[in-house]
Amino acid sequence: MNFEKLIVKHVQELVPYQSARRIGGHGHNFLNANESPKSEGYFLNSTTFNRYPDCQPEELIERFADYAGVHKSQVIATRGSDEVIGLIVRAFCEQGKEGILIAPPTYGMYEVAANTNNALVATVDRHEDFTLDANQIIDAVKSSKFPVKVVFIDSPANPLGIVFKKEELEKVLNALEDTLIVLDEAYIEFAQKEHDLTYLVKDYENLVVTRTLSKAFALAGIRCGFAIANENIIKALLKVIDPYPICDPVAQIAIQALSDHAVGMTLERAKCCNERREKLRADLNELPFVEKIFESHGNFLLVKFKDGPKVFNRMAQKGVILRSFETKKGLKNCVRISIGSDVELEELIRYLKELDI
């Protein structure tokens, strides 16, 4: 039997998202996935594990809504914010006819979600310094050869680390009232408070903000994310989500993580991470083969080396796993370094100082 003939044509051509775990690497010091270097302790009540969970656990939705400063009707919980991205494309883009707009280099899951759902992909060029303004996005949407239903903007951006300004976002929202604007705030806890634009959801019906517990909350392993939007968008997403997206252990842990005390610890952890990030920046600036260190509002630094592949490969040989962006648009010789623990970062700098480049 020729199984290829059974597979849908666009699925045959898919390239899976190359996550840090999928790329792999043998090492002991993993600075490639923007994870927290430390896991917190939580408790589980196993007496309900024999029952199917609620699709949207009420206490979890209420806790996150309180944390984000929105009404619970404006929130949907998902298996990480990656699932939200896929749900948005599935619910709002007609297969083969409509699509999304992205601004490379950006988070790879936007394009993967579009390809998986047979949606089209348009791109907009960034400025030479990788910044992005409203006029670029508006012009790209209006000049697209197909209807752009969704625009994805990550802020802080991954892997660039920069933020999208409030005035630029509002200009886009006002000019593209019939387009869904998705603001990915996966790293927002590491940024200054003024960069959190979630509150704009109350003023703009076409704005969706995505969040995750994977980064600052140090819960990448449980896969829990959220979308914040007007009630009609949330209802549409609930139509295409699986029946039981949030399993009971995940809900229990996430609810604990969103308590006032735990949130306070998370924000303090993010502050300490930022301090380590700037210490790492200072240490890297002393190395003669570092050409540029990008601005960062996340738990990572994007670094341009004189020879990025050599740095990446030599660190891997030492068991320090970084993330290369060598093949991404405009990022030749660039390597992203996650902000690990003091010990992990000290080891990285020690090995980098041994390099002859």
Regions found by a protein language model. Name each.
Residues N206-E286, K292-I293:
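PLP-dependent aminotransferase class I/II
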Residues M1-E59, R63-D66, P147:
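N-terminal "arm"/small-domain region of PLP-dependent enzymes with the aminotransferase-like
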Residues P57-G99, N117:
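Phosphate-binding glycine-rich loop
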